[in-house]
Structure formats: C-alpha cells, structure tokens
Amino acid sequence: HILRSCFDNKVKKFVFYSCTVMYQSSDTPISEDDFNPSNELLPQYFGVGHTKLYVEKMCEFYSRICDTEFVVLRNSNVYGPHDKYDLEKSHVFGATITKVLTNKDGKLPVWGDGSEVRDFIYVEDLTKRTEELCSRETGPLLIANNGSGESTTISNLVEKIIDASGKGMTIEYSKNTPSFKNKAPINVDKINDILENKETTSLVDGIEKTVSWYRENIETT
C-alpha cells in the first residue's frame, strides 16, 4: 500500500531500509553486484532475507512506472541509542550491551567462539546519510550497501564493550550454544561515491556513546 501510495500521490522520494542478510558468507567485502539470487540464503535468515528481497523488487517495479526515486539501503548492523536491549528481542550488539552493563559476577557468557565477522553502523550515521540522500537526486532506483566498511569479529566487539563499561570481566565462550558461522564484511564504495560526507562514527566512539545513553536512560528506569 505504501508503494502504491507513492505512485498515486507522486511522492518524490522513497527510502527502504533493507539489510545484508541475503549475502553469502565471505572472507572479502561483498559488493551489491556480488549478490546471486540463485544462491540459497543462510537458513537463519531465510524469512527476513526473502522479505527484504521482495520489497526491493517491488521498489524496482514501481521505479519503472512512476516518477518517484527509490533508494534501497542494504544496511549492515545498526546500533546505538534506542536499540532493542531486551535479551528476548535484541541482536548481538544490544544483547551484549545489556549483558555487560547488568553483569554482577564478572563472568560474561558469549554464544559461539566469537569468530563471526560483522559490519556495524552507528544509528546517527544512518539518519544523516538518509537525510543527505533525500536531499539530492539519486535516479529512479539506487540500491547500495550501507555500513562503516570496517568489519570486526564478535569477540573484538565484546571486548570493546567491556572496555567502555569500565568493568573487569572474563569472557566465557560457549561453543555448544547456537552461533552463526558466517562472515559478513561489506563493500561500501558505491554509497561513498555518492555521499558528500563519507565519515562514520568509529566503533569505539559509537560504543562509548551507547553505553552512556544506556546508563542514563535504561539503568535509571
């Protein structure tokens, strides 16, 4: 209904937040053109991956028949203030923040061995990029990876969050618990060629901002 409304009301711009879960595991940064629809999606991302791809195709369809400019951002792992910090609903970043900042015994359980690789983008960087893309012409359809372009292992992420918390803590990796053995570095050359401001918040700075926000807004509630 939203896409049809863009068509009916001659909306100038439509931005869809897709993601990178449709990509296969890779040791090298993955570009938009590396995606092969004939490859099976990773089982754990089957539902969300195909849903995102369906909406991407609907954006492509409407881009062919109306004047609306469609922007599809394949976001990496978005993190920061107002993330989901409920352990029943959160992803790896939000869950780790909660586990570290609420920890009482100095032992931090982590699923898997920490070798998974992810790209992370701070939420304010996402909003700034969205605003810039909305303020300029991008053509009928733009599909672009959107992330920091700097991948990190889960073990490195956990260590940085512990450092930012100021707590002394021992990490206990649990290899018998569910973990996703995939690597998801992404190539962000395409979006960087378009953006005037290519800078992104470093992971260390983003974590520190998030820890401060959590302590001011979650721990006090």
Show where each model-derived region lies.
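Conserved Rossmann-fold NAD(P)-dependent oxidoreductase catalytic core, especially the SDR/UDP-sugar
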Residues: 1-45
